[in-house]
Amino acid sequence: TGKPGPVLIDLPKDVMAEFGSAEYPKNVNIRGYKPNTSVHIGQLKRALKMLSKAKRPLFLAGGGVNIAHAQEVFREVVEKTQVPVVTTGMGRGAISTKHPLFIGNLGMHGAYAANMAVSECDLLFSIGTRFNDRITGKLHEFAPHAQIVHIDIDTASISRNIHVDIPIVADAKEAITKMAEYVEPCSTSKWLAQIDAWKNEHPLTMRQNGVMGPLDIFNAINEKFDDAIIVTDVGQHQMLTSQYVDITENRQIIMSGGLGTMGYGLSLIHISEPTR
C-alpha cells in the first residue's frame, strides 16, 4: 500500500507476552487509504509540456527512483531531455554520480551547485521524494522561482510539505517509463553553463591537513572498489559517504534514511548480499 518500507508496530509488553495466531491477507484492504497508482496520462503530459517550455528545468530524484529500480529508464529520460539532476541522500545512485548531467545531493548535506540549482530553477520535476526538512530548509524559501511537479507512489506525500503545481500519484518506474515515450529535448545549454560555473566556484571538497583523512579513504574506495556495495551506519560518516563516494551502475550504496537507525550498517552487511 503506497510507499514500501518497514513499519513500526508498538505493542504493550503484556500483549507481546500472549499467544495468538494470525493470517496475513493476500490483498490488503485499508478503508481510509486507497491510492490509484496508475499514471494519469493527462497529468503527465501537462507536466512534460511544462518541462519542454522551462528555461531552467531540474530533475530531483529521491529514494523512490531506486526502490522502483528505475535507474536505467531515468537515465534515458535525462539524456533525452538534457535536463540536469540533483538527488536526495536516499536518491543517490538514481543516476551515476559520474554522469555529466548529475549535479550532486541537495539540502543541508548537499553540494553548493545543487542547492543553487534548486534555488534558481524555474521548474522542479521531482520523483520519489517526500520533501523532508533535510533537503528543503525553510519551506517558504525552497525553490522560490519554480513550478513543481511531484511524482510519488504515496498520495499522503503529495503537497504535504511543499505545495506542488502538478501532482501525479504513481509508481516511479511506471511514470518514468511513460515519460520516456513522450519527452523531447529541452534547450538547456545556458542553464548547464551556469551550473558548471557554480560547480567551479564552490567545488565539493574538504580541508586536508597532511595526514590521512576521510577524503583519502573515499578516494581510495572510488579508485579500488568498482564493483562494490557500500553500506553505512548512521552519523557524520554516512553524510560524507553520500557526498563523496561515487555511485555508478556497478557500485551501490545502502544506508538508513529518515529514522537514523544506529547499528543499521552491521546488519545490512549480513543481509544485503550474504554470498559476497
Predicted regions and their residues:
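Glycine-rich beta-alpha junction loops
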Residues: 11-16, 63-65, 92, 155, ...
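Conformationally flexible catalytic loops at phosphate/diphosphate-handling active centers
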Residues: 2-53
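Glycine-rich phosphate/diphosphate-binding loops that line cofactor/substrate pockets in enzymes
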Residues: 1-3, 43-58, 77, 118-120, ...
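Conserved small/polar residues in nucleotide/adenosyl-binding loops
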Residues: 269-275
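Active-site diphosphate/adenylate-binding microenvironment
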Residues: 196-268
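Gly-rich Lys/Arg/Thr-decorated short loops/hinges at beta-loop-alpha junctions or inter-strand turns
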Residues: 22-32, 94-98, 194-205, 250-252
